[in-house]
């Protein structure tokens, strides 16, 4: 059985992580906030993409359906509300949560 990984992507790093992991023996679910973001995610049989903003309830339902072993938060550095919600929901659901964080740039 392959590892099931949820990537909440909102940065280039999230997209690149999905591309790297797509070649491994894993099942990926990538969530993004927009249709444009979804269009940037690699198209492979082991990668599913959901373009929808998720609140607490939406994240909990997503976890119940996908059943990830690991959740990686690769959202934008300024998306503090999304990060806190994801961390809290993962803790409640018993899903390992990791934050992939790049420093914000002056242009952002």
Language-model segments: residues:
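Structural motif corresponding to alpha-helix initiation and N-cap regions
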Residues: 56-57
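Fold-independent oxyanion-binding glycine-rich loops
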Residues: 8-11, 32-34, 52, 74-75, ...
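Glycine/small-residue-rich loop that forms an oxyanion/phosphate-binding "nest" at active or ligand-binding sites
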Residues: 60-108
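A short, flexible N-terminal coil/short beta segment enriched in small residues
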Residues: 1-28, 79-83
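N-terminal glycine-rich FAD/FM-binding segment characteristic of electron-transfer flavoproteins
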Residues: 12, 16, 20-21, 39, ...
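Short, glycine/charged-enriched secondary-structure capping and boundary segments
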Residues: 20-23, 43-46, 85-88
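Short, compositionally biased "basic patch" segments
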Residues: 23-39, 88-103
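N-terminal beta-loop-helix "entrance" segment that forms/cooperates
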Residues: 29-53, 108
């Amino acid at each position: 059985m392959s590892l099931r990984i949820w990537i909440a992507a909102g940065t280039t790093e999230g997209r690149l992580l999905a591309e790297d992991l797509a070649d491994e023996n894993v099942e990926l679910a990538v969530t993004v906030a927009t249709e444009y973001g979804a269009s940037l995610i690699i198209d492979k049989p082991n990668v599913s993409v959901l373009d929808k903003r998720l609140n607490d309830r939406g994240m909990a339902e997503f976890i119940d359906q996908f059943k990830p072993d690991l959740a990686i938060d690769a959202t934008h550095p300024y998306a503090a509300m999304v990060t806190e919600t994801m961390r809290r929901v993962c803790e409640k659901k018993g899903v390992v949560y990791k934050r992939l964080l790049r420093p914000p740039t002056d242009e952002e």
